[in-house]
UniProtKB/Swiss-Prot annotation:
One of its GO terms (biological process) is regulation of cell differentiation. The gene is PLEKHB2. It comes from Pongo abelii. This is Pleckstrin homology domain-containing family B member 2. PANTHER family: EXPRESSED PROTEIN (PTHR14309), PLECKSTRIN HOMOLOGY DOMAIN-CONTAINING FAMILY B MEMBER 2 (PTHR14309:SF8). Keywords: Endosome, Membrane.
């Protein structure tokens, strides 16, 4: 930063209303700082013109104040602050008063410093990463307890073989076992085929016929 304007000004004290000579420095960032003397060791006060100052009065515009002895009111200026405080000053001459007025007015209306500060805050807000989440969301198959499927029939299915050897898949109703319960296993039911009784009937008929013929021959002899 650099000085925009520096010099001596008379300042009226707040309580005793006495005029005191102070050294003033106006910085390029808009800060007006005044000291006890030119050595700048003891700071009396400071005003951030773009933020704290709401008006600047000069000459006859100044209110409730009388110039110091030997000075006219045209050499006076007042800095009206936002918090209600008014800083009453008196320059060495009328030209010096106007020079301070224009310089302070430019510093008050210049919002480049404030805008850059706001822009920096917005940039940091936008570029900030989202909050870190330590726990990942569970996968759908973990949430519902279903494992990978690679068989020919879905889990919990009955395979029934009919008498003719045909296989049928029948859904199996099983109670819910919870999120981590045991998964149902495939069940295979094989029904035995019924024996073909046609061959037994034929053998029985042949045996009956042979028995009848033997008995007939026996009765014929007698």
């Amino acid at each position: 930063m650099a000085f925009v304007k520096s010099g001596w000004l008379l300042r009226q004290s707040t309580i005793l209303k006495r005029w005191k000579k102070n050294w003033f420095d106006l910085w390029s960032d808009g800060h007006l700082i005044y000291y006890d003397d030119q050595t700048r060791q003891n700071i009396e006060d400071k005003v951030h013109m773009p933020v704290d100052c709401i008006n600047i009065r000069t000459g006859q515009e100044c209110r409730d104040i009388q110039p110091p002895d030997g000075k006219s009111k045209d050499c006076m200026l007042q800095i009206v602050c936002r918090d209600g405080k008014t800083i009453s000053l008196c320059a060495e001459s009328t030209d010096d008063c106007l020079a301070w007025k224009f310089t302070l007015q430019d510093s008050r209306t210049n919002t480049a410093y404030v805008g850059s500060a706001v822009m920096t805050d917005e940039t940091s807000m936008v570029s900030s990463p989202p909050p870190y989440t330590a726990y990942a969301a569970p996968a759908p198959e973990q949430a519902y307890g279903y494992g990978p499927y690679g068989g020919a029939y879905p889990p919990g299915t009955q395979v029934v073989y009919a008498a003719n050897g045909q296989a049928y898949a029948v859904p199996y109703q099983y109670p819910y076992a919870g999120l981590y319960g045991q998964q149902p296993a495939n069940q295979v039911i094989i029904r035995e085929r019924y024996r073909d009784n046609d061959s037994d009937l034929a053998l029985g008929m042949l045996a009956g016929a042979a028995t009848g013929m033997a008995l007939g021959s026996l009765f014929w002899v007698f």
